[in-house]
A protein has these predicted regions:
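Polar/acidic, low-complexity leader/linker segments enriched in S/T/G and N/D
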Residues: 1-85, 207-216, 220
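Short coil-to-beta-strand transition motifs
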Residues: 101-103, 176
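Short, flexible beta-strand-to-coil junctions
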Residues: 54-60, 93-96, 159-167
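Short, surface-exposed beta-strand/loop "edge" segments at domain boundaries and coil↔beta transitions
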Residues: 2, 56-65, 96-101, 128-136
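Short conserved beta-strand and strand-loop elements enriched in small hydrophobics
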Residues: 83-100, 156
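Residue microenvironments linked to proteolytic maturation
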Residues: 3-18, 86, 110-212
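Charge-rich (especially acidic), low-complexity segments
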Residues: 215-233
């Protein structure tokens, strides 16, 4: 199989598209707070489920890319079928591959829906019995759950394959785009990528859209994530 090139920030062409600022899983959000408190009991029967922002359409992201509404909604509809089949696994930290490595799987996307131009989702962390019963961290899902229980906000990195084309001032994702998954990553703060609990939060998001365009490219972050990945292995 021919290895796909990872397209860097503001680069056009065909390759692997990784969006470090796609969204967030915020443990301090009021919709997640009850779930976090329940998870602290380490009850084996209690699942680690969280709400998250997964992606956004028609908004230029930090990589200088825009996902058109038609394309992202089409891929979201396809992904719903993957969810129904129980195949919507994703990884902790993004690999430089279009394939999902089962040894690195940390969570399952159990539901997705739209809130305006925001693709929302529900994640189930795939934790081990040892983590629930004794707090032993042995899997990627355990690592993610332990971070969430400690109040760490995790980034959501969408992963897909497709082409980018310069359209006016934007690098626009083309019709050949195929969504692969939504990985959990450690990402620097990005204004606006959070769960909208109320209208006030949505207004704050609208006010900070321009700030996203001023953030530096994520090449340094990708290097940092590679080091973190080696540490977790």
């Amino acid at each position: 199989m021919k290895e796909l090139k990872i397209l860097e920030s503001n680069e056009i062409g065909h390759g692997l598209l990784i969006e470090m600022d796609a969204g967030w899983v915020n443990p301090k959000d009021k919709l997640n707070l009850d779930l976090i408190q329940e998870s602290r009991k380490l009850d084996y029967k209690a699942p680690f489920e969280f709400f998250a922002v997964l992606q956004k359409h028609d908004i230029p992201n930090r990589n200088g890319r825009t996902y058109p509404e038609k394309i992202l909604k089409r891929e979201a509809d396809k992904y719903k079928k993957i969810i129904e089949k129980g195949l919507s696994t994703s990884e902790l930290n993004h690999p430089e591959s279009s394939l999902i490595d089962l040894d690195r799987v940390s969570h399952l996307i159990t539901d997705i829906w739209w809130d305006g131009n925001i693709l929302m989702g529900k994640l189930l962390l795939l934790t081990s019995p040892g983590f629930h019963e004794r707090g032993i961290v042995s899997t990627k899902g355990d690592v993610a759950a332990n971070l969430m229980r400690s109040g760490v906000t995790l980034g959501v990195s969408s992963r897909g394959v497709g082409s980018l084309k310069k359209v006016g001032e934007k690098n626009e994702v083309q019709d050949d785009f195929e969504l692969i998954c939504f990985d959990l990553v450690s990402s620097p703060s990005t204004p606006g990528a959070y769960l909208f609990s109320n209208k006030e939060d949505r207004d704050k998001y609208d006010e900070k859209l321009e700030e996203e365009k001023k953030v530096e490219p994520v090449s340094d972050v990708l290097k940092l994530m590679s080091k973190l990945d080696r540490y977790l292995k």
